Amino acid sequence: MVAWIATLIRAVDTRTSPPWLLLPLMTLWANLHGSFTFGLAMIAPIACDALWRAAHSERLNVFRQWTLFALLAVGAACLNPYGPEMILVTFRTVALGAALTTVTEWRPQNFTHLGAFEVIMLGAFGFALYRGVTLPVLRIVMVLGVLHLSLSQVRHADLLGMLAPIFLARPLAEQFTALAGDRTGLALRPSAWLPATAVLLLIGVTGLASLRHDVSPPARITPANAIHSTEIAKAGPILNDYDFGGYLDFVGTAPFIDGRGELYGEAYMLRHNRALSLENLPDFLRLLDEYHIGATLLTPSTPAVALLDRLPDWKRIYSDDVAVVHARR
């Protein structure tokens, strides 16, 4: 993400055409992580910035270049096993609506306690006010855009830290004479050995990691002990806590739900959440029978755990600080 955005911003700052050699990076990104759609979306404001800065006589040519680049970037993103379907996943995720509020990483920032995000944000605001920072209009739009994402959803907090410096680097360097002149040019032209060293280090670490076959999540944050101490996989369909779905996938056991919310849909996710929190107790009992649940794997704080302890058809067969397992009698 940083390489993609930084290279596009540099093209705008240096008033050059979009970097066509960057397109393979989009293909790689699309095959690694769903955030590639953010990279596609950012082409629009960056292209508008390029148009804004271009001379009037050059704007038509700049528009054609960035439009072609955007189309090729979309095509590059479609070079994955699922084609254009991967782009649609983002829209299905956003369409989950109220179900997103049940997932911690999709909730808004919580400012009831002072945290690192708030300290950094307030510090940046204080610096801007103290030094009288001014920015071009479209850079303001970009910074406010990532700030909005960072405030509205916890999972996007990193965007502000990763991308805001990229948006601000050239405007601040031009505004503050101590950073202007040759220093700006040097900042935009790093020595070749630095990225080369980083690439070699990445290849080396990846190669060493691939030789290990004992890599697994730590037991203190996963239901590993609960699963290995019981025969829960043989009990039948498992009703699991949302946070345990990924680990069940990891060990090859089918979960009731996992982090791929776009596959389950809003109604399914909300029903699961309301059932386990006993907001709808009758539906929780119906759910157990409807899906022929043979065992449950829940966190100790889940309200449904106390109810299962009292149901005659269920018995607790394992519990620790991480997970509680119930099975049908």
Identify the meaning behind each predicted range.
Residues 10-27, 62-68, 137-144:
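Short hydrophobic alpha-helices at membrane interfaces in multi-pass membrane enzymes
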Residues 181-232, 243-246, 250-251, 260-263, ...:
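Membrane-proximal, lumen/periplasm-facing interface regions of secretory-pathway glyco-
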Residues 34-133, 161:
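Transmembrane catalytic cores of multi-pass membrane glycosyltransferases
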Residues 231-269, 293-301, 326:
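Short periplasmic/luminal acceptor-recognition loop of GT-C membrane glycosyltransferases, typified by
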Residues 2-19, 125-131:
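Membrane-interface transmembrane helices that cradle and orient dolichyl/undecaprenyl
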Residues 269-322:
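Periplasmic/luminal catalytic loop of GT-C fold multi-pass membrane glycosyltransferases
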Residues 19-34, 72-77, 144-150:
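Membrane-interface alpha helices of multi-pass inner-membrane proteins
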Residues 42, 149-177:
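Hydrophobic/aromatic-rich transmembrane helices and adjacent perimembrane loops
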